[in-house]
Amino acid sequence: MSSIGEALVAQLSDRGVDCVFGIPGVHTIELYRGLAASGIRHVTPRHEQGAGFMADGYARVSGKPGVAFVITGPGLTNTLTAMGQARADSVPMLVVSGVNTLTSLGKRMGHLHELPDQRAMARTVALISERVESADDLAPMLDHVFDPFQSGRPGPTHLEIPLDVAGAPYTAQAPTQSIAAVPALSAEQISQAAALLAQSKTPLILAGGGVRKAGDALRALAEKLGAPVVQTVNARGVMFDHPLGVPASPSLQAVRALIAQSDVVLALGTELGPTDYDMYASGTMPEIQRLIRVDICAEQLSRHATELPILGDAASAIDALNAAIDGDVAANGADRAAKARRDAFDEIGPEMRALCDTLAEVRGAVPGAIMVGDSAQPIYAGNLYYDHDRPGGWFNAATGFGALGYGIPAAIGAALAAPDTPVICIAGDGGAQFSLPELMCAVQEKLPICFLIWNNHGYQEIATSMVDAGVSVVGCDPTPPDFAAVAQSCGLPFWRCDTRPGGVAEALQAAMVAGGPSLIEIQAQPSPV
């Protein structure tokens, strides 16, 4: 007879889970009892925050929930930052944790790893937090924590299993999976949206992360409407090198002008949040004349004044609109998009343009790569203006929750989800030091990741912000390690280059020939502050 812990692993496998990230501990041993026989791959990070970020990167690339196994108390607290990032970016993630015995909960007796209320803490970032208290709970609790991955706006969920429950015999009936329904689109609302768009003279599409898997249909709709497509950070790549594409932040004045001049705006799968639409913290959002908004989350639809809110999946809505709209609508979309691109690129200034050129050099050296970023200067520049050549292949932690240390472990998760695709991680020397130990995980798993370290000797973005605010610069110059020595200690091939044109591409191409994980240090000049 199996234990409840073993049964949980088996039921995760039945739900399509094929990889978990975790560091075993005495409070999760029962989960590991069934893991070897399950066929699920286990990846051991060097810190539980890394487990969460790996699960995030895995989920973004695979489209399946990333799963982390963590111990009671510190294991879960270490994972909360990654859960916060996943919550901000609507990434499906399940964190399974231990917890002390049922009879001890809430009594504060000082047990190992004890917290006053672990689920209450998890709920600050998790969409759902549940506890399995008996064998009969297991299947319905799994249904509940998986529901958001299938039926609404995804995010992190949490399931805890007390020590005594995990080891108890599993005697429940064979589980049946309950699949939550995706909200059905309203045919009447689709018809209304099609009519508004058909009458438009200057339509525009705002594309968010909800369209990542619908690139072909989105391009068809944009071409039919003659509508420029402004892409948020999580939608980059869906309109690569397309005349209607505007791969620039809607926080830029040039893009805001384009939006304001559009008589109908169709927002697809975007939360219209300030980390995309007000990056400069002006306290204002782009001016919109008439807004049609499609979102899978009813709560999101209530947050902005919308002429026509449509509850449903963005990809399904695109298909429905393509079917409902006959003929071409506007003829000037490509000209409007081209002007916005030119003006936006001019607006970001010479320093940011140079960083964008470096990103284009990386893209040209390794076409079709998945590019994962930490909060680093090239990533900030790319979030302002960068066109990637792979849908869903540009993502980072510089927006939303904005957690440093994301890039290295998230790239590992991405590489595990797409083992035949090159993965490039871009991290600053400051952010990289949050998660350098995870390099050994990439080495151990033999993953084809090139880690680019943008070394400007400190937190240059913060130092600049301090100067702009009239504050003396303090605490922004942590001494970076010798990255050549770091690479050698991890057994990683190492290259060093500077920012002169061609240098990064040459190092990247050499790294691709070498195969496996590698480290490239880009010696950037610190900005004068």
Per-region residue spans from a language model:
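N-terminal alpha/beta PP-like core and its mobile active-site loop of ThDP/TPP-dependent enzymes
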Residues: 1-325, 361, 441, 448-451
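Active-site diphosphate/adenylate-binding microenvironment
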Residues: 5-8, 13, 23-36, 337-418
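A general structural motif
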Residues: 47, 107, 111-112, 180-192, ...
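Thiamine diphosphate
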Residues: 104, 108-113, 259, 301-302, ...
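Short glycine/proline- and acidic residue-enriched helix-loop micro-motifs
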Residues: 124-131, 176, 336-349, 490-492
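Phosphate/pyrophosphate-binding active-site segments
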Residues: 136, 172, 287-375, 496-529
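Active-site flanking residues adjacent to catalytic metal/cofactor-binding acidic residues
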Residues: 268, 294, 373, 428-429, ...
